[in-house]
């Protein structure tokens, strides 16, 4: 049996430290063959850098996926092309730099992973995630024994729809972006594993990894606030 761990959005230094401490231990204790992590919030909660990506990979992560914060860190667009274990969303415009998938290999078994961005309530230019996923699955079929699809999206309806759309054609469809895990993990009728959102790796007593008080204040008075990462909570 092949075992794969998918790690939800790594949020800032607290999330990185937890992932880098837990992943090696989980690989040993659970006998994991593959570890995939979403790293798009690794740099202070917004984006990633080459140095941070290398650190996460060196901790035992096999592939890093990204989402709508992919370009938040200045200069990252000049580094991503050299990192073939990091993939940006596949449905970004074709001119964007970087890899649109990663293929991992262990024990004679290959797993392909790619991400698509949702388009509902997402403020980023992206092509149709359904058609893009169709094209990616056709392209990767024959190159890998299993295909894991991440949908980085806001709307649960869009995530569920993609799960049903790909049921029986891929190994798993896993949602990210909201930082809140959903209680709907299941295997769809044709055999595809599905979960709307796997949650985050970051501070527990927070609002999506941020300090609570400024977020509440912003909701109540509508005034601009600085949403800082929370560093004083245990992580999940």
State each model region's role:
Residues 11, 40-42, 69-71, 91-92, ...:
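Catalytic metal-binding/acid-base residues of hydrolase active sites
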């Amino acid at each position: 049996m092949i075992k794969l761990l998918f790690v939800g959005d790594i949020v800032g230094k607290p999330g990185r430290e937890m992932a880098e401490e837990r992943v090696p231990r989980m690989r040993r204790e659970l006998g994991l063959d593959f570890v995939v992590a979403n790293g798009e919030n690794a740099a202070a909660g917004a984006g990633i850098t080459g140095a941070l990506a290398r650190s996460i990979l060196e901790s035992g992560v096999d592939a890093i996926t990204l989402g709508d914060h992919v370009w938040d860190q200045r200069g990252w667009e000049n580094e991503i092309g050299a990192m073939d274990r990091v993939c940006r969303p596949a449905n970004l415009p074709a001119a964007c730099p970087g890899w649109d998938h990663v293929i991992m290999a262990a024990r004679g078994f290959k797993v392909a992973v790619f991400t698509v961005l949702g388009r509902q309530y997402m403020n980023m230019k992206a092509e149709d995630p359904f058609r893009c996923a169709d094209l990616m699955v056709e392209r990767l079929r024959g190159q890998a024994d299993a295909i894991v699809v991440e949908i980085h999206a806001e709307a649960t309806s869009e995530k569920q729809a993609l799960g049903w759309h790909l049921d029986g054609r891929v190994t798993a469809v896993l949602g990210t972006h909201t930082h809140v895990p959903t209680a709907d993990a299941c295997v769809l009728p044709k055999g595809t594993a599905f979960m709307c959102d796997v949650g985050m790796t970051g501070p527990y007593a927070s609002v999506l990894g941020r300090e609570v008080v400024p977020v509440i204040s912003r909701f109540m008075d509508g005034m601009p606030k600085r949403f800082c990462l929370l560093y004083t909570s245990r992580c999940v």
